């Protein structure tokens, strides 16, 4: 902070706040009197008529948090009365900064001790800052500055504490144990308001932590990821765990790269690579305020300097601008329309709130900061003044927004001071709103509400003017006009009649298109084609259920297209294609997301015979071979596999969506596709391993598909269950390459490379999530299994559940002779006559365990409901195992469940029961395929897209969900009865 003016609480000469009730005032005065019993300063104050006395009574009456703190810790108030506010705060912040130091030189404290020290310092700082703020001895700038300074000190102390502890345990070797962070290579960035020095009263803190794996402090680089993960888990605990002394700060580390799949701390180089290759515009905005606050500050500054080209691009990037504007639209649309209600309003995120001012600034920083370094500053007020000085906004706008910003920050602080809660919502009740009004010095809630409404409207108006442009959509109808910022009333009425519930949002989206904010609409020709197409687009989308949702998904798709001329021309000349697009957008958010993320998959929809041709193995194989054949090296071959797999999965989905194929056919097609992709990946992997390690004389490999892959029943998004079998000549000890490997390591390497080829995430996505737990001994066994070991295990060690799983085993690619041997083993095991009573007992126990550990969520959980797909699969697999003992021929392993059920049931089931089970299997498969295709997650009729609800009803020719649900209940109840009867009767 800048040099603080020496002010004391005794300087208060006017009391602007007052208690909200006499009862609160009495309670506050009682606290003061109790505190005076052990304090001369407080006793002297109570006996006086000083304004400070009235102020403290009002402050404690208005804030239960402050009152409770004064009651529990009167010494804090005593200390505050005896020194200036800056002196008091500086001493507490310095105490926090050195809280990591132990009594003995170089000895690390227990976590509990530093937690206590930091919490006590936080309590004292929070108490003092609140009183200074409420009394207006501090303005918003000082309040946020002191809070930020304390947060920086607390995080620094915690980091030094953790580094010193790691040093003492031998994990690190510090340069200087008296200054643990010095030259440590540990980068701790404060993000958001902490980075800008604008922390709010009860704020959480956003941190990003990187480390240099080459740093000399790290003793074992292989352990570094886990070491840092443990340290950061302790950091979070030190700062945010609530103890008897309270907490320091809620700590959020989710602004790091890809937080869902990365550790809490990641290497600097990995972070830089992420931002350079995958960084998003919202991450650019987040890093505008980033600041090194702890750890190795010099390393932090170097990192931010290196990151500058990512955050502030030298040239205007129109795709980025489109993205920025898209964010702006989304925020605006989220706010709704109509009058701003004060009660319950979100001061941060609501219309006219703090976030809109921050976004107003950051948007222009992202666009102009690359060419104008003066626009790269962190603080909101400073940046508003710089934007005015640089001519980006006028001076009046800057002053209005600065005044509004600090007014809203004052409101935010009062809301949070009441109970020390991280909330931004104004109270819903009149008494509680009056409390906030009095804390701000207003006479009543009406005057506060009027002042707040004026500020919110000012911010909203200035925010809405950001990048204001004009464009007109010319149409023959004359009642679709999209000009400037204001909606045309006639246009809104037309959109309502077309079927849209939120016409203003739709109009806003269309204005966006015609402003050229997306890459697909940047060229004049593209905008002209889209202009001509828009009336028909609106008509067709308006005919779909929940037209607004579908239209929004189409907008999302459009925003990701690299170009638009070809698409707009095709849609204009091909009504069928337009209807198909609408079908996707209204029914299948998952497919809509796929084409938004990977527009190239859309190309396949242009094939004239798409819906007429079944995607059989013969159809898919040449297309895959031709496309992959152009790969020049290993990685390119894998990328081509990812591209063609994504495209063909999508096209299979389109056929299912339109009813061109059934759910059963989709399962077979997805399985055929997986077979071909895995086979091609195996060929590439074998070639890659051979180039490094040579061939293994007599070496043979075969891939076994298990589960739904084995039985031709994959769904969209299914993972794949694999087993890799191998064999080799016994007399050969190692491969014949430049870097020879023994047989176990050689075929393990093949397996590991295959898993990576199929499941490693890349820019083109992944092929499949691979599960190899069905191999002998599961995760405890080797990843690759020799054929002799596989046979021995199946004959002597396998459990019943593993033999049940073997009924779906199918060799999908590999050496033909080894495939033959594997199939012979499958047949041998599955034709063995078993103890039926034992199989029955095991199956009943397994099904009971699933019921217990994985209960269905609801009737729409087709897999797990009693009498659902799991029961039907158990029936088929159970019958396959007991068939030999009952003189019935089992179908080959890897037979589709429906075919196996019919073959086995014909000799071992009641004919009506067999028909019912088959009917249920077909319906549940159809529904499962559609749901997995169209959405991620579970099917909830209340939340599902309207188009998907229609689809699942049409899947079984049901008029509505009520009839469909009734039939699901009928069939599942019957199947559970059949399951119990089949197993019990066997």
Curated annotation (Swiss-Prot):
Catalyzed reactions per annotation: [glutamine synthetase]-O(4)-(5'-adenylyl)-L-tyrosine + phosphate = [glutamine synthetase]-L-tyrosine + ADP; [glutamine synthetase]-L-tyrosine + ATP = [glutamine synthetase]-O(4)-(5'-adenylyl)-L-tyrosine + diphosphate
Root EC class = transferase
Q: Which InterPro entries does the record cross-reference, listed alphabetically?
A: GlnE (IPR023057), GlnE_rpt_dom (IPR005190), NT_sf (IPR043519), PII_UdlTrfase/GS_AdlTrfase (IPR013546)
A Gene Ontology term for the protein's cellular component: cytosol
Tell me where on the tree of life, at the top rank, the source sits: Bacteria
Task: Tell me the PANTHER family matching this sequence.
Answer: BIFUNCTIONAL GLUTAMINE SYNTHETASE ADENYLYLTRANSFERASE_ADENYLYL-REMOVING ENZYME, GLUTAMINE SYNTHETASE ADENYLYLTRANSFERASE
Q: Which family does it belong to?
A: Belongs to the GlnE family.
This one is known as Bifunctional glutamine synthetase adenylyltransferase/adenylyl-removing enzyme
The species this protein belongs to is Rhizobium meliloti (strain 1021) (Ensifer meliloti)
What are the top taxonomic ranks of the organism? Bacteria, Pseudomonadati, Pseudomonadota, Alphaproteobacteria, Hyphomicrobiales
**What gene is behind this protein?**
glnE
